[in-house]
């Protein structure tokens, strides 16, 4: 007979390992390649020493002259708070009782819930890797008869629960925890649950975020590629080595544009690009460029079972969350996902995973991870934007 106790054991012993593996390597090739470590985690924070420049204790001199003065390595400390990442499943008591004498039916029930959790978590984690930590999904352009027009639907999907916020980030109390009912990708419009929103409630330039996630998401690639503001607690205006290579208004993509960025990183930061990430439109544009000049398109096998085209042995991968017209040239060895622990089930004092929801005939289980992403050498990364897509 199937019981809640046996379901608990299944979640711990059968599902956790598979889900962890999928979330660590199956989200996208970039995440599969970067390191994951519990080092440099102190309490609720990540504190990591970052070296920049070179050791100054070198020089040349006369046969009997003074030796060079010592001048050790340059260090600064990166500081980030661990972000709290959650995924939740829910099973009704009715569904459990209906399948208590049918193990196969209960397994199918759990499989369906876990597959849904895995898909949603993979989607959300993959999206965050390209964000700036604020959790902004898009901006509102207009609201007409409850239909919301936004500037981009790349980060939106049916079923997502979102909050609407003022452009300053302040929550709009009448427009929180709204579930997306439909997404029109050609018109860039969405509809949401609840009473119809108006342009007075949600004015132009309001922002959309995942429920309760504003300012709580991991520090993704967008946070790195800026020449102003702070990064990891340091001001870029006084720490110029935090500023990466950025070229805007690229237009037509070519090998020369890519090689110029790679050469800059090698000559000025000593960085070796080992992964290129771009939007699908940029990848198609590069493939068109190769075809125009009758170049062979080489295909590579990557960790995690992925395949990619290559440029001089460097894989070029497209990602659905990469901004349009953008290409990132990265040294994955500079990135580390610092974590307090790997994915775990949230357990009660009794050690149980599945817990009854207060006042409801349902049980829920929550998957958690406390982590954030740090790039040890931001100046060793590059971004090309304004690329004409195909």
What are these model-predicted stretches?
Residues 1-59, 71-390:
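Core alpha/beta structural scaffold of self-assembling particle/tube/pore-forming proteins
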Residues 63-64:
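Glycine-rich loop at the start of a catalytic domain that most often binds anionic cofactors/ligands
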């Amino acid at each position: 007979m199937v019981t809640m106790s046996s379901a608990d054991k299944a979640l711990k012993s059968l599902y956790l390992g598979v889900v962890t593996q999928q979330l660590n390597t199956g989200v996208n090739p970039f995440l599969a390649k970067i390191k994951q470590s519990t080092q440099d985690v102190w309490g609720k924070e990540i504190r990591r020493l970052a070296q920049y420049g070179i050791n100054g204790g070198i020089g040349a001199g006369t046969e009997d002259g003074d030796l060079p003065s010592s001048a050790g390595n340059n260090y600064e400390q990166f500081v980030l708070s661990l972000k709290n990442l959650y995924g939740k499943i829910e099973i009704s008591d009715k569904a459990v009782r209906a399948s208590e004498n049918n193990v196969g039916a209960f397994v199918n029930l759990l499989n369906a819930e876990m597959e849904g959790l895995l898909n949603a978590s993979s989607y959300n984690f993959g999206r965050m890797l390209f964000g700036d930590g604020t959790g902004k999904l898009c901006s509102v352009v207009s609201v007409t008869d409850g239909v919301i027009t936004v500037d981009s639907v790349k980060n939106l999907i049916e079923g997502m629960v979102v909050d609407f916020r003022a452009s300053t980030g302040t929550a709009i109390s009448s427009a929180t925890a709204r579930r997306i009912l439909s997404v029109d990708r050609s018109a860039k419009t969405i509809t949401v649950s609840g009473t119809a929103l108006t342009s007075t409630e949600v004015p132009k330039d309001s922002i959309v975020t995942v429920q309760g996630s504003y300012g709580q998401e991991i520090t993704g690639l967008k946070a790195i590629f800026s020449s102003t503001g702070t990064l990891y607690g340091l001001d870029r205006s006084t720490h110029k080595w935090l500023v990466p290579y950025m070229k805007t208004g690229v237009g037509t993509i070519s090998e020369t544009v890519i090689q110029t960025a790679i050469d800059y990183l090698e000559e000025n930061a000593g960085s070796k690009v080992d992964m290129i990430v771009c939007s699908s439109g940029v990848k198609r544009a590069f493939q068109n460029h190769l075809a125009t000049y009758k170049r062979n398109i080489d295909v590579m096998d990557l960790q995690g079972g992925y395949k990619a085209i290559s440029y001089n042995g460097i894989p070029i991968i497209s990602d659905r969350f990469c901004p349009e017209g953008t290409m990132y040239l990265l040294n994955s060895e500079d990135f580390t996902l610092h974590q307090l622990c790997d994915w775990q089930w949230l357990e009660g004092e009794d050690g149980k995973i599945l817990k009854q929801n207060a006042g409801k005939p349902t049980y829920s289980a929550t998957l958690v991870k406390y982590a954030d992403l740090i790039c040890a050498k931001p100046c060793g990364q590059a971004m090309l934007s304004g690329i004409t897509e195909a």
